[in-house]
């Protein structure tokens, strides 16, 4: 049986990445909430970046 999670970096970034979040009003609200909470990673696309 095929497992449900078949990881793909491209699909993940397109669906949950920073630019995808910025496209919609709801996505921008998510980013605002995560900034207010003080998250070091706002979106999944931040995981690859070295600070």
From Swiss-Prot:
Q: Name one GO molecular function term.
A: structural constituent of ribosome
The yes or no answer to whether the keyword Acetylation is present is no
Q: Mind listing the GO biological process terms from this record?
A: translation
Q: Zinc among the record's keywords? A: no
One GO cellular component term noted in the UniProt record for this chain: ribonucleoprotein complex
Q: Supply the Pfam families for this chain.
A: Ribosomal_L34 (PF00468)
Per UniProt, which keywords does this protein have? Answer: Ribonucleoprotein, Ribosomal protein
Cross-referenced InterPro entries? Ribosomal_bL34, Ribosomal_bL34_CS
Return the HAMAP family for the record. Answer: Ribosomal_bL34 (MF_00391)
NCBIfam families the record matches: rpmH_bact (TIGR01030)
Q: Which family does it belong to?
A: Belongs to the bacterial ribosomal protein bL34 family.
Output this protein's name: Large ribosomal subunit protein bL34
Q: Which organism is it from?
A: Borrelia hermsii (strain HS1 / DAH)
């Amino acid at each position: 049986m095929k497992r449900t999670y078949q990881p793909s970096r491209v699909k993940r970034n397109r669906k949950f990445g920073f630019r995808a979040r910025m496209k919609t009003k709801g996505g921008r609200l998510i980013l605002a909430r995560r900034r207010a909470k003080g998250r070091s990673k706002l979106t999944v696309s931040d995981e690859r970046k070295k600070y």
